[in-house]
């Protein structure tokens, strides 16, 4: 094989379809937009949820609830994720971020009781579920709210 014999693999290169370049191309005249109407015009599209003038579903349904501006969103850590640490380790939010258990601490870290804990650990976090706190203490470890 020589340099002048190299060619791209079959099907790896596709020619861009240029519209509005003559009837023989199959995409001339109306450029694949069909005949007249809103969708044939420049910038012609209907907004999401538009139902042709009929009162749309999102306006037919009643408003519900509100957004609590004081809501704190915690980064969640489950008990089973804490098993990666050595026995007797003091698990802090900084350590959880450093080891990649948590990517973003958000408003703090909450430990939940999913899975089982097999090691005695001292866990420091911003919040604990009742089952998580109970499981940590049952293994002889300690939990501390910071």
Curated annotation (Swiss-Prot):
SUPFAM superfamilies from the UniProt entry: Ribosomal proteins L15p and L18e
Protein's GO biological process: translation
Biased composition (Basic and acidic residues): 1-13
Region (Disordered) residue spans: 1-55
Keyword RNA-binding tagged: yes
Highest taxon, organism lineage: Bacteria
Entry keyword annotation includes rRNA-binding: yes
HAMAP family associated with the record: Ribosomal_uL15 (MF_01341)
Quaternary structure (record): Part of the 50S ribosomal subunit.
Name of the featured protein: Large ribosomal subunit protein uL15
Native organism: Staphylococcus carnosus (strain TM300)
